[in-house]
């Protein structure tokens, strides 16, 4: 059975933060380091057992800084991925928790997927 091909668009946020050690769940932001999406996927290889993941870099910023301009950029990147690679079966967007629901709501309204 072939694995689904899934694009993973990275936008930064908590999920991409690099702590001082693996259990740094509180003060990770003080380290001021973030994974780009391909580095994040390499750090957690287990999902690769379930799908062929295609990393797509967009930006790596705190989710508190994401707003309308970024939402448009995310939507444009989703459309670009779909248009450029018809073999993509799905898209995952990594995102921090602070504005996740706003981004999801915006994409629900405007994405033409």
Task: Mark where each language-model region is.
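N-terminal glycine-rich anion-binding loop in soluble enzyme alpha/beta folds
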Residues: 2-83
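Short Gly/Thr/Asp-enriched flexible loops that form oxyanion-binding sites at enzyme active sites
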Residues: 93-113
């Amino acid at each position: 059975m072939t694995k689904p091909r899934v694009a993973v668009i990275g936008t930064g946020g908590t999920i991409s933060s690099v702590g001082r050690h693996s259990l740094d769940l509180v003060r990770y932001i003080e380290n001021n380091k973030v994974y780009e999406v391909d580095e994040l996927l390499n750090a957690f290889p287990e999902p690769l057992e379930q799908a062929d993941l295609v990393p797509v870099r967009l930006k790596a910023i705190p989710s508190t800084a994401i707003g309308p301009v970024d939402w448009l950029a995310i939507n444009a990147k989703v459309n670009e991925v779909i248009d450029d690679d018809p073999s993509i079966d799905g898209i995952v967007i990594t995102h921090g928790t602070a504005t996740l629901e706003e981004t999801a709501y915006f994409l629900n309204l405007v994405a033409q997927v």
